[in-house]
């Protein structure tokens, strides 16, 4: 879970959201700012540590790209961590998985570490594994991204409603420029790509 900053604060998709917020990222995915920009996309939200979270197509609207996981619930990362712990206990991994970054409090980390030690001991003694500690860890977890994610989706839905033609054969309302539907280029508000 990484702290992010809005790079284009006046973009309509980012209207009335926090200028700094957290977002979970996959540890296996990274498309750099340079790669996004070389593809003609505009980076809207990014993190020094986690990289780009959100970018849009050159028209600023038609295609929206999320590299983070704004859709995650509070316990989504906990479920992924649990999966990795059990992969370790089943011998698929050679060491216990790291905690999800910036997600577990110090206390939650100690609880998780203690569980791994107890599970390792149970395996050595040929006993059943103890139940994973979701009930104990869950209340210690914070969701620091959900409200912002909902606001972005709501902004997008509002723009779709405002711009889309009622005639399903036509993409936009009459008078909407398909290359600049948000009029960002016309207003000089479009960041250079």
Identify the role of each PLM range:
Residues 5-193:
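Amide-donor transfer/coupling interface in amidating biosynthetic enzymes
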């Amino acid at each position: 879970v990484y702290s992010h900053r809005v790079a284009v604060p006046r973009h309509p998709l980012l209207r009335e959201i926090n200028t700094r917020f957290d977002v979970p990222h996959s540890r296996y995915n990274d498309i750099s700012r340079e790669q996004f920009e070389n593809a003609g996309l505009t980076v809207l939200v990014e993190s020094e540590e986690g990289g780009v979270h959100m970018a849009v197509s050159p028209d600023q609207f038609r295609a929206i790209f999320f590299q983070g996981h704004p859709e995650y619930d509070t316990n989504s990362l906990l479920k992924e961590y649990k999966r990795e712990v059990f992969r370790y206990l089943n011998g698929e991994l050679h060491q216990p998985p790291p905690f999800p970054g910036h997600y577990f409090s110090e206390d939650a980390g100690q609880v998780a570490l203690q569980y791994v030690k107890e599970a390792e001991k149970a395996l050595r003694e040929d006993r059943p594994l103890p139940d994973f500690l979701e009930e104990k860890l869950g209340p210690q977890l914070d969701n620091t991204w959900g409200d912002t994610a909902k606001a972005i989706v709501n902004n997008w839905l509002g723009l779709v409603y405002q711009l889309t033609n009622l005639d399903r054969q036509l993409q936009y309302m009459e008078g909407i420029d398909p290359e600049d539907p948000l009029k960002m280029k016309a207003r000089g508000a479009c960041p250079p790509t």
